Design a protein with these regions (language model features):
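N-terminal twin-arginine translocation
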Residues: 32-38, 49-72
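N-terminal secretory signal peptides
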Residues: 1-38, 49-52
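Conserved small-residue
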Residues: 20-33, 42-45, 71-620
């Protein structure tokens, strides 16, 4: 989540009556064994393909006085290596994107660039009609999709989330939803949602958007969407817009899942709240259904999705509630998907069971079904409140769940009632390619007052990463084992307290947010600490402690951290996609505040392309 959206939503949240979040945050666990750590075996530890060089030995006949001329050995083509060999870059506060020596960075798509045919940003404020065709603002999650008949390492589709407007290129002054005109609302809403662009690599190795492609399309806060699934009857028949599109994911059948990280429309509060806070399924190829809000996956502040599938094509979708605190969920489809018929999967996400994770003190966990009539989800239920952020016991709040639709619409409360564990702001989730591990970033929770094994720090300013393993590596499992993978922080912050130090080996960071395991099993983490931010030590800002937000590789065995990329002034690093050969990485730079990406112009959120200059895989 961008700190900008936190600020934008604050007045709206403050005006609402609130229920303190869940007593089931592991407070019952803390007495059991607060120092617990479980060591899980990892089946994807530093996978690499090493270069193989061969040599032929020429054998001559000892009785032959003349040695035959050996046949020349062709120079072997080096095998691509995916070992992590880049030289770590230093933490810094430069107003540029810093990458290791031997790498290059190009800007692919800036806020205000054209997606659909029209006039791009040129320094003047646009009309809503103009901005509807532009790339929106605050680029966030994204996915790369292959195109039939196109070499996927040289071209394809990129679907990109736009979380929040880059208001500096839209209008003069600040935006106030309470007093905004219809035109101002339309302008603000034009800059959120997603964009799909066809991209291609040129002969010079640089990537560009293919202008005029039939795939280039905007889906905005002004567009129309439908709802489907068990709670669709509680939503409007036609929904205006989606917004706060934070991170994202994909399905095995090639659709894009974009996540609404807000349960209200804070840019236009006249819209019904129930219409927002959903996972929206969009087909980037424009072959299947219209963009659809899938209510079976629950309504909360969604961050991203990540799927696990087995050999029988059964699939689970993992999700985190970006709240302080929030729960971790999975949705299990009730049938196998079709790998040969995309159209047969059109309603896969409407039928299945939503579960919430419960973390036990002994290193085990279980999935609690969020089904009406089960786990306390009935009329006369009791929401336990959140003693994790209060040392004073809270009175439970009565809540009624009359049917499954109400369970899904009121998912945040239902998860606590069902016994889900509330965590320190679960953001991105990633699943190992062989299903052997799942990682979740818990970005931070400065409000935590009671510790426990899964959330072990009071005033958790810097966050941590948790790892769990499904029984049998199965998406259908009802139990799992877990461990804390690492705690963010830095030893030089020890004067502010032990909870600021962390246990990172190598390059330190704060507030892990984006996380992704690439197809070769390499774990990448992106950070989102607020700027200037509180490091926990008086007189030291968070940028002074850690440098600008950055992207890291973390070895899953040694847990050694290496800083790969550092962003420009004021930005968050978010979003990661790549070509199949991993020679091109796409990364988003969100809300820069300095003089980037174009000197002398307004700062703009942008998608960048990171490549090696020798055309080898990124990371080597």
């Amino acid at each position: 989540m961008s700190h900008l959206t936190d600020e934008a939503r604050a007045p709206y949240r403050d005006a609402q009556s609130s229920i303190e979040l869940g007593d089931n945050s592991l407070e019952a666990i803390v007495a059991a064994n607060p120092a617990r750590r479980t060591v899980l075996k990892n089946g994807l530890l530093g996978l690499s393909i090493l270069p193989m060089l061969g040599a032929l030995a020429a054998c001559g006949d000892d009785d032959d006085s003349s040695s035959p001329t050996p046949t020349p050995t062709p120079t072997p083509t080096p095998t691509d290596s995916y070992a992590i060999n880049f030289a770590s870059v230093a933490a810094n506060q430069n107003d540029t994107v810093t990458v290791p020596s031997g790498y290059t960075v190009d800007v692919l798509l800036k806020a205000g660039d054209s997606i659909e045919a029209g006039t791009p940003y040129s320094g003047s404020y646009p009309t809503p009609a103009d901005a509807e065709k532009w790339a929106g603002g605050n680029h966030d999650g994204m996915e790369f999709f292959e195109l039939s008949g196109t070499d996927a390492n040289s071209g394809g589709l990129l679907a990109i989330n736009f979380e929040y407007p880059d208001f500096n290129i839209l209008m003069a002054g600040s935006y106030n939803a309470a007093t905004a005109t219809a035109s101002q609302k339309a302008l603000a809403l034009s800059a959120v949602g997603i964009g799909v662009v066809e991209i291609a690599k040129g002969t010079d190795g640089k990537w560009a958007v293919k202008a005029g492609s039939r795939f280039n399309k905007r889906y905005t806060g002004n567009s129309s969407y439908k709802a489907s699934g068990p709670a669709s009857g509680l939503l409007s028949p036609t929904i205006k817009g989606m917004l706060n599109n934070c991170a994202s994911g994909r399905t095995p059948w090639g659709t894009y899942l974009t996540c609404e990280e807000s349960t209200d429309n804070y840019l236009d509060p006249t819209q019904p709240e129930e219409n927002y806070g959903w996972v929206v399924e969009i087909d980037p190829y424009q072959e299947l259904a219209v963009p659809t809000k899938r209510t079976a996956l629950g309504r909360f502040d969604h961050e991203n999705t990540a799927y696990m599938a087995n050999s029988d094509h059964r699939v689970a979708i993992y999700m985190g509630h970006d709240g302080t605190p929030g729960c971790i969920y999975k949705f299990v489809c009730d049938r196998a998907y079709s790998a040969s018929n995309r159209a047969a999967n059109i309603d896969m996400l409407d039928h299945g069971t939503l579960y919430v994770a419960r973390f036990n003190a002994d290193g085990t966990g279980e999935w609690r079904a969020m089904v009406h009539g089960q786990n306390g989800l009935t009329v006369g239920a009791s929401d336990p409140g959140n003693t994790s952020q209060s040392t004073t016991p809270l009175a439970p709040t009565p809540v009624d769940f009359n049917n499954q639709a109400e369970v899904l619409v009121n998912c945040i409360s239902a998860a606590r009632v069902a016994g889900g564990t509330v965590m320190d702001r679960p953001e991105w989730i990633t699943v190992a390619p062989d299903n052997s591990a799942i990682f979740v970033t818990l970005t931070n929770n400065s409000g935590r007052r009671v510790t426990n094994p899964a959330n072990p720090r009071v005033t958790n300013l810097h966050g941590h990463i948790i790892k769990f393993k499904e029984d049998g590596n199965s998406p259908l499992a009802m139990k799992f084992s877990w461990e804390i993978f690492l705690q963010a922080g830095d030893p030089k912050l020890a004067p502010g307290g032990a909870n600021l130090v962390g246990d990172i080996k190598g390059d330190t960071f704060s507030s892990p947010d984006g996380i992704r395991i690439d197809p070769k099993g390499r774990l990448w983490v992106q950070t989102d600490h607020s700027v200037p931010g509180n490091s926990g030590v008086t007189g030291t800002t968070i940028d002074q402690a850690f440098g600008h937000n950055a992207m890291f590789h973390i070895d899953q065995t040694t847990k050694q951290s290496k800083r790969f990329l550092v962003g420009p002034l004021g930005c968050e690093i978010t979003g990661l996609a790549y070509t199949p050969d991993l020679k091109t990485f796409f990364v988003n730079i969100q809300h820069p505040t300095g003089n980037w990406p174009v000197a002398g112009q307004q700062p703009r959120s942008s998608t960048i392309v990171v490549r090696r200059t020798d055309a080898q895989p990124v990371g080597n």
